């Protein structure tokens, strides 16, 4: 077994026992990137010098008997949406090409303090707007299970890097499913924490009331360990929740016997791939065999979730992206004749088609005469969606559903059909509108060898419950041991 075949916690155990060094693991990760990334294209940039320096420092701490954390020395990748001091950060956009942040995002600082070498920045849909990684301004990433297909998005580079075993884990962000959907498409675990559980300070904003960073790993236990490092209140983020952080690993092995798990009937609809439905329904039966009770529940306003999301998220994006004008950082149009030209030409040249589409949608929703009819109404429906979940959680401990309606699709298949692309998040975005935690865990493969994910949704701040439920299923299977055919 190669070092890169180990999970985060397996590697951490070897580091603690002196059976491997962080420098060896980091060099193995860098070698794996060199070997397979020409096919996967998960990385936008690799910080070899920084990662190796951090690895050597980790080895020195372990040698002196003072590791910074249980994960000290475990190499990690970062979605290119997190500000990294001294390392270019683009959010997958031309408009930020060449931007080198002067400080770290809070989660990056926490990872560094915990001793994890950061190997590099991972590809993503531009400003996290997309479900296939094809809106990246630089190149699309490829799914390690079939390189002609998408790894999902917007955190597709993070998912692909973990699935290809280029890194032991990664961080992504989830605004409407951008951690969970690519996790489902790549046989990885993706956890979107409760809104406010993880700091957004230093995370380039898409939709501020929806964005949430989270872990992407090969196993549930790894996700719990990584969440433990990054989950905490942050005075620099006004939306950060001042809620106690539990030990996410404490009850991982507690099982599901006696739990009530809801199955929302609105999440099993026409348009779902038959093989996806079959895999998910088999997972539901597995939970019954493990001692859980399945309960049919209804989330009646789910049918309005997609329209609600695509009013609220673009409205927030149109405001957040107004700051990119060529004056302070990133791209500046060279052929401008006036300040007005600088603004207009920089945005014309710097933003891609999908970002422009969403800015226009959001500007329209907020415009005079349409604000009440569209944006305000969407916010009211958002409240109804949140109330649906509140009622459901009075009956059950968690909800189970597919993560994605289909397995990974061919690159180029949906790029000219925005609505079809938006439908990829139909099962994931209601959770963001309600601010709830959600997790995707591998639950099988199609006949063509494409991964399928099971989504688990929970009460606010019950990430520990989701991890426990996911682990009960994962314990019965070896999906995470399977290697992508690279």
Swiss-Prot record:
EC id: 6.3.5.7
Q: Matching Gene3D superfamilies, A to Z?
A: Amidase signature (AS) domain
Entry's family note: Belongs to the amidase family. GatA subfamily.
- Reactions performed catalytically: L-glutamyl-tRNA(Gln) + L-glutamine + ATP + H2O = L-glutaminyl-tRNA(Gln) + L-glutamate + ADP + phosphate + H(+)
Give the function comment from the record: Allows the formation of correctly charged Gln-tRNA(Gln) through the transamidation of misacylated Glu-tRNA(Gln) in organisms which lack glutaminyl-tRNA synthetase. The reaction takes place in the presence of glutamine and ATP through an activated gamma-phospho-Glu-tRNA(Gln).
Tell me how this protein assembles.
Answer: Heterotrimer of A, B and C subunits.
Domain of life, per lineage: Bacteria
> Which InterPro entries does this chain map to?
Amidase, Amidase_CS, Amidase_dom, AS_sf, GatA
Q: Which NCBIfam families match?
A: gatA (TIGR00132)
GO MF annotations, alphabetized: ATP binding; glutaminyl-tRNA synthase (glutamine-hydrolyzing) activity
Show the GO cellular component annotation of the record.
Answer: glutamyl-tRNA(Gln) amidotransferase complex
One GO biological-process annotation of the entry reads:
translation
Q: Which UniProt keywords apply?
A: ATP-binding, Ligase, Nucleotide-binding, Protein biosynthesis
This chain's protein is named Glutamyl-tRNA(Gln) amidotransferase subunit A
The upper taxonomy is: Bacteria, Pseudomonadati, Myxococcota, Myxococcia, Myxococcales
Q: Which gene encodes it?
A: gatA
Asked whether the UniProt record includes Protein biosynthesis among its keywords, one would answer yes
Q: Which SUPFAM superfamilies match?
A: Amidase signature (AS) enzymes (SSF75304)
The residues responsible for catalysis, as annotated, are: 79 (charge relay system), 154 (charge relay system), 178 (acyl-ester intermediate)
């Amino acid at each position: 077994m190669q070092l890169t075949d180990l999970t985060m916690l397996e590697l951490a155990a070897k580091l603690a026992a002196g059976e491997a060094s962080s420098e060896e693991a980091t060099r193995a990760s860098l070698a794996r990137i060199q070997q397979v990334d020409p096919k996967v294209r998960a990385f936008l940039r690799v910080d070899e010098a920084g990662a190796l320096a951090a690895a050597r420092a980790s080895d020195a701490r372990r040698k002196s008997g003072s590791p910074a954390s249980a994960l000290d020395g475990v190499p990690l990748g970062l979605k290119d949406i997190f500000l990294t001091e001294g390392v270019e950060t683009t959010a997958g956009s031309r408009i930020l090409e060449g931007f080198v942040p002067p400080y770290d995002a809070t989660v990056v600082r926490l990872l560094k303090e915990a001793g994890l070498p950061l190997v590099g920045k991972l590809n993503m849909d531009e400003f996290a707007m997309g479900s296939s990684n094809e809106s990246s301004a630089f190149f699309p990433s490829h799914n390690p299970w079939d390189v002609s297909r998408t790894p999902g998005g917007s955190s597709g580079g993070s998912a692909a890097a973990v699935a290809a075993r280029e890194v032991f884990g990664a961080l992504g962000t989830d605004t409407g499913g951008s951690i969970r959907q690519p996790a489902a498409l790549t046989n990885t675990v993706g956890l979107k924490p409760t809104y406010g559980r993880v700091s957004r300070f230093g995370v380039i904003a898409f939709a501020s009331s929806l964005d949430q960073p989270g872990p992407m790993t090969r196993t549930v236990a790894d996700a719990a360990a990584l969440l433990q490092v990054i989950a905490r209140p942050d005075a620099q983020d006004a939306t950060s929740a001042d809620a106690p952080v539990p030990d996410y690993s404490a009850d991982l092995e507690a099982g599901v016997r006696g739990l009530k798990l809801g199955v929302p009937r609105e999440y099993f609809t026409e348009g779902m791939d038959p093989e996806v439905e079959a895999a998910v329904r088999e997972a539901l039966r597995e939970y019954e065999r493990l001692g859980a009770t399945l309960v049919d529940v209804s989330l009646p306003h789910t049918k309005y979730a997609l329209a609600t999301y695509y009013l609220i998220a673009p409205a927030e994006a149109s405001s957040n992206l107004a700051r990119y004008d060529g004056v302070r950082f990133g791209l500046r149009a060279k052929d401008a004749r006036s300040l007005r030209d600088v603004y207009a030409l920089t945005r014309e040249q710097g933003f891609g088609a999908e970002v422009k589409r969403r800015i226009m949608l959001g500007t329209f929703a907020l415009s005079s005469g349409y604000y009440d009819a569209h944006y305000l109404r969407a916010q009211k429906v958002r409240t109804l969606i949140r109330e649906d979940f509140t009622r459901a959680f009075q009956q059950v401990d968690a909800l189970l559903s597919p993560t994605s309606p289909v397995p990974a699709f061919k690159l180029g298949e949906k790029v000219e059909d925005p609505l079809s692309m938006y439908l990829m998040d139909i099962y994931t975005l209601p959770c963001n509108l309600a601010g709830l935690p959600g997790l995707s865990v591998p639950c099988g493969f199609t006949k063509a060898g494409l991964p399928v994910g099971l989504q688990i949704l929970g009460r606010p701040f019950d990430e520990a419950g989701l991890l426990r439920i996911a682990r009960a299923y994962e314990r019965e299977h070896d999906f995470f041991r399977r290697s992508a055919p690279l």
